[in-house]
């Protein structure tokens, strides 16, 4: 499905408007162009952040306008698109534009959502819930497979560790890989501090380099990275996104690590 290339899913947390979305996509395209023979990248952004900490937090432009903007990104830059779907009713509309439909971590056991998303025929990115062990993902995987769709990605995004904290257990990478589906490591959501800032989540982006390197060394097939021109003023996940400059600086290391690890057989866990 991905021709043994590293998978890189990148973009801002939420669609903040057409101009800024196109700007970020264009800069990512330029950054990633030299790696096109080794990295398959997808632009990601959300049309609706339905699980914000506060009722008053920015959620995005909504389904219709959001998909219009994502379609323009796809047409302008020729890049594959990922967005997350929160209700079964949105799945088919989203699949008309997006190559990958993402089931959010909090919703990864919702049968109707999983089935509706899979029935579109799009690639389904299943994010492992913060409350689940990697072994528990067998159930969500089987719900997707029940539709006849076997185009699945599995994403590790950390596990709840007490209050307002997440930890990343790298044992999850080989465990999820046993499914036979590519495993993605979400290096920016994994450094979140959920609810730590009262009405929004905090984050420890200084650990993104370490965790992303560890995941690739453990055999991850790719990375999920949220990035922005200016994370400090981003309307969602400001504390856990990388700047485009930070993203570009880490890219050579990610490329080298993936190439290195792919060159030898991983010992089975």
Swiss-Prot record:
Compartment(s) where it occurs, according to its Swiss-Prot or TrEMBL record: Cytoplasm
Family: Belongs to the KdsA family.
GO BP annotations listed: keto-3-deoxy-D-manno-octulosonic acid biosynthetic process
Keywords, alphabetical: Cytoplasm, Lipopolysaccharide biosynthesis, Transferase
Full protein name: 2-dehydro-3-deoxyphosphooctonate aldolase
Gene Ontology CC: cytoplasm
Disulfide bonding pattern of the chain: none
Single GO term (MF): 3-deoxy-8-phosphooctulonate synthase activity
EC numbers on record: 2.5.1.55
Origin organism lineage: Bacteria, Pseudomonadati, Chlamydiota, Chlamydiia, Chlamydiales
Reaction(s) the record says it catalyses: D-arabinose 5-phosphate + phosphoenolpyruvate + H2O = 3-deoxy-alpha-D-manno-2-octulosonate-8-phosphate + phosphate
Organism (species): Chlamydia pneumoniae
NCBIfam families linked: KDO8P_synth, PRK05198.1
Pathway(s): Carbohydrate biosynthesis; 3-deoxy-D-manno-octulosonate biosynthesis; 3-deoxy-D-manno-octulosonate from D-ribulose 5-phosphate: step 2/3; Bacterial outer membrane biogenesis; lipopolysaccharide biosynthesis
Keyword Nucleotidyltransferase assigned: no
UniProt keyword Cytoplasm, yes or no: yes
């Amino acid at each position: 499905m991905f021709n043994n290339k590293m998978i890189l899913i990148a973009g801002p947390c939420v669609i903040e408007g057409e101009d800024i979305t196109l700007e970020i996509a264009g800069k990512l395209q330029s950054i990633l162009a030299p790696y096109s023979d080794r990295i398959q990248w997808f632009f990601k952004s959300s049309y609706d952040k339905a699980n914000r900490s506060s009722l008053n937090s920015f959620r995005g432009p909504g389904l219709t306008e959001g998909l219009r903007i994502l379609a323009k990104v796809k047409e302008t830059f020729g890049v594959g698109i990922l967005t997350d779907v929160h209700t079964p009713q949105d799945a088919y509309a989203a699949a008309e534009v997006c190559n990958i439909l993402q089931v959010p971590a909090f919703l990864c056991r919702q049968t109707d959502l999983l089935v509706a998303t899979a029935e579109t025929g799009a690639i389904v990115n299943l994010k492992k819930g913060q409350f689940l062990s990697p072994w528990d993902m067998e159930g969500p995987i089987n719900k997707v497979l029940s539709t006849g769709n076997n185009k699945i990605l599995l994403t590790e995004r950390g596990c709840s560790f007490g209050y307002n904290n997440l930890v990343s257990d790298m044992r999850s990478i080989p465990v999820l890989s046993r499914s036979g589906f590519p495993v993605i490591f979400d290096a920016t959501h994994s450094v979140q501090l959920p609810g730590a800032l009262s009405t929004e989540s905090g984050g420890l982006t200084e650990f993104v380099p370490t965790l992303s390197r560890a995941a690739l060394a453990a055999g991850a097939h790719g990375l999920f990275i949220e990035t922005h021109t200016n994370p400090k003023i981003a309307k969602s996940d400001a504390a856990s996104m990388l700047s485009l400059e930070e993203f570009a600086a880490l890219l050579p290391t990610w490329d080298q690590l993936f190439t290195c690890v792919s060159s030898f057989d991983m010992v089975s866990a």
